[in-house]
Curated annotation (Swiss-Prot):
The keyword Disulfide bond applies. InterPro entries: Ig-like_dom (IPR007110), Ig-like_dom_sf (IPR036179), Ig-like_fold (IPR013783), Ig/MHC_CS (IPR003006), Ig_C1-set (IPR003597), MHC/Immunoglobulin (IPR050160). It comes from the Eukaryota. SUPFAM superfamilies: Immunoglobulin. Heterodimer of an alpha chain and a beta chain. Beta-2-microglobulin is the beta-chain of major histocompatibility complex class I molecules. GO terms for biological process: antigen processing and presentation of peptide antigen via MHC class I. Belongs to the beta-2-microglobulin family. The lineage of its organism: Eukaryota, Metazoa, Chordata, Craniata, Vertebrata. It comes from Labeobarbus intermedius. Keywords: Disulfide bond, Immunity, Immunoglobulin domain, MHC I, Secreted, Signal. Component of the class I major histocompatibility complex (MHC). Involved in the presentation of peptide antigens to the immune system. GO terms for cellular component: extracellular region; MHC class I protein complex. This is Beta-2-microglobulin.
Length: 116
């Protein structure tokens, strides 16, 4: 019995060491070049993160945009994950559009630049 417990603890320790934490890489862009007053799609692509504990929000002036679509969580080589969230929107001059990403205990907002 003691050998089984020791082996189980070894396995948990091994998995913990192998599962390195990786911060997400975030890209915020639109489907078409940004033009105020023209319908578009705001996209936030988050990749290269581990563990998969993550929340993505699309914002207009700090308020959550409704009717967003999110892909299923997918993984890459090296136990890293990626996820994309999008929403149809019509950009208005003077308003700020952003993607807020919470990964583990870190939260950051990334702005959409219409000239990208």
């Amino acid at each position: 019995m003691r050998a089984i417990i020791t082996f189980a603890l070894f396995c948990v320790l091994y998995i913990t060491v192998q599962a390195k934490t990786s911060s997400p890489k975030v890209q915020v862009y639109s489907h078409f070049p940004g033009e105020y007053g023209k319908e578009n799609t705001l996209i936030c692509h988050v990749s290269g993160f581990h563990p998969p504990d993550i929340t993505i929000e699309l914002l207009r002036n700090g308020e959550i945009l409704p009717n967003t679509q999110q892909t299923d969580l997918a993984f890459e080589k090296g136990r890293q994950f990626h996820l994309t969230k999008s929403v149809s929107f019509t950009p208005e001059r003077g308003l700020d559009y952003a993607c807020k990403v919470r990964h583990m205990s870190n939260t950051n907002a990334y702005s959409w630049e219409p000239n990208m």
